[in-house]
């Protein structure tokens, strides 16, 4: 068997880099010389000194969401690979629920406008034979609803303009619940502009449901017995105490509606960017702008309105006052917001608003400069026109002066 050095000295085209790229070790077998040429077999042997570590491919995928504009749309959240098992026992909980120990239901959140008149909502719901409850005064109205044999709770959030249903499909919410309170919506959106968030939840309503989970890890069971929480992509509602369970649902509803309300502003921002992109491209190409100052002012007005809805006119950037005095509800609200990436999304939206505002200000400055240049030319033309008049008047005076007879001419005539 020949060494690598003798092989490379004979076959100059073989390099150590090429052999490394093959990922194998090469050896020469039965090498002999015939007719002045090397002949032999190259045997490939798999490397045994390299250990291939197994990679955990247990990666959580984003749940697909149906939207009227786009049949399938990813939720605005990010996932990272699960390279190790969680230590708090939540993986055990998810595995247990996947075996149909408890029924997994859908929690649908739909934002239909900027807000709801809750007093009018209660009147409309009462007219339909429902029994609304002012769960959180001036903030959330809740009522029980039944559709196609499914019974669940529905919450209307007045400040966010959102409806959160617990136990119903998206089509049921759109076709049955939203029309009931449509008249109470403030600045409603078009149907195709509704923003929707979908999550699964499990509700523990009695001791029997709790017993179904008694086989879980001891670290998880005590937590289920005392509070509601978020486990991965699954909401766990503890309704052993029905009143506390409704408050927990309200906290989850506030976090979910925060996401859909933010999604409305994100969509408005994307529409603005798509409108102004052609203008920016035309400027880069040196094309003459067919843009009026009023259009630029409307554009920057839209940006200020989006920024105001994000930072001033709503509680998107802060925790509602209600949850400050309720640590458990505050934890639920913050966990949902963290899971839906509310903080990073707000920062990204503010960055886009900053850039777009600077862009609009540059356009307004450009238009003002163009208008000032136009006015300067008008002034120049007026000065030139006035100068022509002055020259003409001077010529007339000079001509009349030259045509008048002088004293010498008068003496000569005498």
Swiss-Prot record:
Q: Which residues lie on this side of the membrane: Mitochondrial matrix?
A: 30-373
Subcellular localization is given as: Mitochondrion inner membrane
Disulfide pairings = none
**How would you describe this protein's topology in the membrane?**
Single-pass membrane protein
Q: Which UniProt keywords apply?
A: Membrane, Mitochondrion, Mitochondrion inner membrane, Transit peptide, Transmembrane, Transmembrane helix
Q: Tell me where it mainly resides.
A: mitochondrion
Q: Which InterPro entries match?
A: DUF155 (IPR003734), RMD1/Sad1-interacting (IPR051624)
How does the annotation summarize its subunit structure?
Answer: Associates with the mitochondrial ribosome.
The similarity annotation says:
Belongs to the RMD1/sif2 family.
> What does this chain do?
Component of MIOREX complexes, large expressome-like assemblies of ribosomes with factors involved in all the steps of post-transcriptional gene expression.
What is this protein identified as? MIOREX complex component 10
* Species, as recorded: Saccharomyces cerevisiae (strain ATCC 204508 / S288c)
């Amino acid at each position: 068997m020949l060494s690598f050095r003798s092989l490379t000295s004979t076959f100059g085209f073989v390099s150590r880099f090429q052999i490394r790229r093959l990922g194998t070790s090469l050896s020469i077998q039965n090498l002999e010389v015939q007719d002045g040429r090397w002949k032999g077999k190259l045997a490939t042997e798999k490397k045994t000194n390299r250990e291939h570590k197994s990679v955990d491919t247990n990666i959580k995928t984003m749940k697909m969401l149906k939207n009227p504009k786009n049949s399938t749309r990813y939720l605005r959240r990010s996932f990272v690979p699960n390279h190790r098992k969680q230590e708090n026992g939540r993986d055990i909980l998810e595995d247990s629920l996947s075996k149909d120990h408890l029924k997994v239901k859908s929690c649908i959140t739909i934002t239909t406008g900027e807000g709801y008149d809750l007093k009018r909502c209660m009147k409309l719901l009462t007219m339909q034979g429902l029994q609304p409850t002012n769960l959180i005064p001036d903030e959330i109205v809740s009522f029980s609803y039944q559709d196609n044999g499914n019974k669940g709770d529905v919450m209307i959030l007045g400040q966010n303009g959102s409806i959160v249903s617990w136990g119903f499909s998206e089509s049921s919410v759109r076709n049955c619940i939203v029309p009931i309170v449509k008249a109470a919506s403030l600045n409603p959106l078009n149907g195709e502009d509704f923003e929707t968030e979908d999550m699964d939840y499990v509700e523990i309503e009695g001791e029997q449901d709790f017993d179904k989970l008694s086989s879980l890890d001891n670290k998880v069971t005590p937590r289920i017995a005392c509070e509601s929480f978020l486990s991965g992509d699954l909401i766990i509602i503890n309704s052993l105490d029905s009143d506390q369970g409704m408050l927990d649902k309200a906290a989850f509803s506030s976090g979910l509606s925060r996401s859909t309300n933010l999604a409305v502003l994100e969509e408005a921002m994307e529409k603005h960017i798509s409108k102004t992109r052609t203008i920016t491209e035309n400027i880069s190409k040196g094309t003459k702008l067919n843009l009026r100052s009023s259009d630029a002012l409307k554009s920057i007005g839209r940006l200020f309105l989006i920024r105001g809805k994000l930072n001033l006119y709503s509680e998107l950037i802060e925790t509602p006052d209600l949850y400050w005095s309720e640590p458990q509800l505050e934890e639920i609200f913050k966990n949902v917001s963290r899971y839906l990436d509310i903080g990073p999304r707000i920062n990204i939206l503010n960055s886009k608003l900053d850039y777009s505002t600077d862009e609009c200000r540059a356009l307004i400055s450009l238009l003002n400069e163009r208008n000032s240049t136009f006015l300067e030319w008008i002034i120049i033309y007026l000065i030139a026109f006035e100068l022509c008049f002055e020259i003409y008047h001077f010529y007339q005076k000079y001509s009349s002066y030259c045509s008048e007879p002088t004293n010498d001419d008068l003496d000569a005539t005498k």
